[in-house]
Amino acid sequence: MIHHIPNVLSKEQVQYFRNEMDKIEWVNGKVTAGTLSATVKRNQQLPEDHPLTHHLSNIILEALGTHPLFLSAAIPLDIIPPLFNRYENQESFGFHVDNSIRRIRGTNERLRTDLSCTLFLSEPEEYEGGDLVVEDTYGYHEVKLPAGDMILYPSTSLHEVTAITSGCRIASFFWVQSMVRDDAERHMLFNLDQTVQNLRMQLGDNHSEVIKLTNLYHNLMRKWAEL
């Protein structure tokens, strides 16, 4: 399931990110690519070990930790610290699949990549081309969101970033290990959680149907969650 997560960052935060990024030198994006994906990857990245990368990454992680739609859709166990990329001058990233296991930089800890995330830091009108194209069982989805918004999709999906024909596309990208690894189970829990939230607003927290559905949600979490 593909989820649009709006307003992860405010417009003011996005502008701060962009201003700070202008102060440092970008590097070849192949440094974080796997063997196969490196053959189709043409972009630039902020250096993984730069203090600014850590600083901006922490701002995103803090924002995600309090974003109700992200928490409902991802059911995150852990998040690989965000990285940042830039596309310009016909740069692109051809169809590929993300590595199933990734190491958290600076540690020996490894995480399973259940969900892939792209947080847009450029407005759609700032560039042409550069669409994120995600392939799933329902076809191809072309994604270009406002700055500060994020797309969340299963890491099992083939995807690409089409060539930039003008302007510049800046984004953050990262992965989530979910407590619920199966996408179909996560989707059911998401729909159930959203239904519970809507009923709470309509009927109140103490209504019997709200309590029953909340009980069902937590029992399914007990059945499916891996910690």
Swiss-Prot record:
Cofactor: binding comment: Binds 1 Fe(2+) ion per subunit.
A Pfam family hit: 2OG-FeII_Oxy_3
Disulfide bonds: none
This protein's record includes keyword Ubl conjugation: no
Residue ranges annotated for the Fe2OG dioxygenase domain, each copy included: 78-178
Amino acids binding Fe cation: H96, D98, H159
GO biological process, one term: intracellular iron ion homeostasis
EC numbers, comma separated: 1.14.11.-
GO molecular function, one term: iron ion binding
Ligand binding (2-oxoglutarate): R169
Keywords of the record: Dioxygenase, Iron, Metal-binding, Oxidoreductase, Vitamin C
Cofactor requirement: Fe(2+); L-ascorbate
Name of this chain's protein: PKHD-type hydroxylase ABAYE3291
Organism for this UniProt entry: Acinetobacter baumannii (strain AYE)
